[in-house]
Amino acid sequence: MANIVFKLSDKDITTLMSRITFDTENLPQGMKARAKYQNTTVNIYQSGKVMFQGNHAEAVSKELLPQHSQLNTNKTKKKNMANSFLEQTLMYDQFNCIGSDEAGSGDYFGPLTVCAAFVTKEHVPILKTLGVDDSKKLTDTKIVELAEQLVTFIPHSLLTLHNEKYNIQQAKGWTQVKMKAVLHNEAIKNVLEKIDSSQLDYIVIDQFAKREVYNHYALSDIPLPKKTKFETKGESKSLAIAVASIISRYAFVTYMDQISKNINMTIPKGAGAKVDVIAAKIIKKYGLSHLDTISKKHFKNREKAQKILKPL
């Protein structure tokens, strides 16, 4: 299945929407309109990007957007291929892969989120055109923009371990490594249920522990051990991991924004001194018990925040 993406102006989008009938209701977040035309799906996103999906995507795009040359898209792809990130991803991107990654493990506030995503060889050109990259290099705004598009066509499983459950498991003796191993394994199994596993070449996990440690903590066997690889700095080696990273980061960022709105304070990410100050303010205004519902209790920030309040 071919995938073609264009970045259009508001005027061009209006013109496109006048040419065929689009649905504008009950759409995924981040999508403006969707249409089915000549066995091709046309998705218009709030970001201004338009995606054509289907075996006739190129022909339909030329018909509906005659003013846009596919040559420009090809030039963009060649430029993207030249950058270092895409050169590094070449090995895994020649195969159909499930990638998995997590977000929030180093942050005092917010949950632990894990995503597994299935990226095929056919997905690779569109992901490069969209600008999928290592999430650590992307702003939160860009992560939200990308994730809201990715979830509409990439088979994936997103799991969130909220703070209250996280703290319960940690009190039982679960380390972060065990939590991540369990969540990664479950997310991968969930994706395998959504796809034809005979089409899968590799499962690539962004390595947070060696294989034997992962196996020890995962509670269940790795689904396809012979196809499973562990990669350090996996986001720079596999687009499947990069996609999983973006979606898991999106879930974490969205949750953090919601916490900030709920308590009317801007909640900082990470576990630095700014976090200590905000945690102290939350204790003073809402109490320690409320702080524990939105944070990871075993982090040193909790103790530091309490010390900040002692002189007051």
From Swiss-Prot:
Q: Which residues bind a divalent metal cation?
A: D101, E102, D206
- Quote the cofactor binding remark: Manganese or magnesium. Binds 1 divalent metal ion per monomer in the absence of substrate. May bind a second metal ion after substrate binding.
* Major localization class: cytoplasm
Question: Which Gene Ontology terms describe the biological processes this protein takes part in?
Answer: DNA replication, removal of RNA primer; mismatch repair
Q: Which cofactor does it need?
A: Mn(2+); Mg(2+)
Q: Where is the RNase H type-2 domain?
A: 95-311
Q: Which reaction does it catalyse?
A: Endonucleolytic cleavage to 5'-phosphomonoester
State where the protein is found: Cytoplasm
Q: Which UniProt keywords apply?
A: Cytoplasm, Endonuclease, Hydrolase, Magnesium, Metal-binding, Nuclease
Annotated Gene Ontology cellular components are: cytoplasm; ribonuclease H2 complex
Q: What EC number(s) does this enzyme carry?
A: 3.1.26.4
Keyword Repeat among record annotations? no
**From the Swiss-Prot or TrEMBL record, what is one GO molecular function term?**
RNA-DNA hybrid ribonuclease activity
Q: What class of enzyme is it?
A: hydrolase
Function, as annotated, reads:
Endonuclease that specifically degrades the RNA of RNA-DNA hybrids.
The family line of this record is:
Belongs to the RNase HII family. RnhC subfamily.
Q: What is this protein called?
A: Ribonuclease HIII
Organism of this sequence: Staphylococcus aureus (strain MW2)
User: What does the record give as the organism's lineage?
Assistant: Bacteria, Bacillati, Bacillota, Bacilli, Bacillales
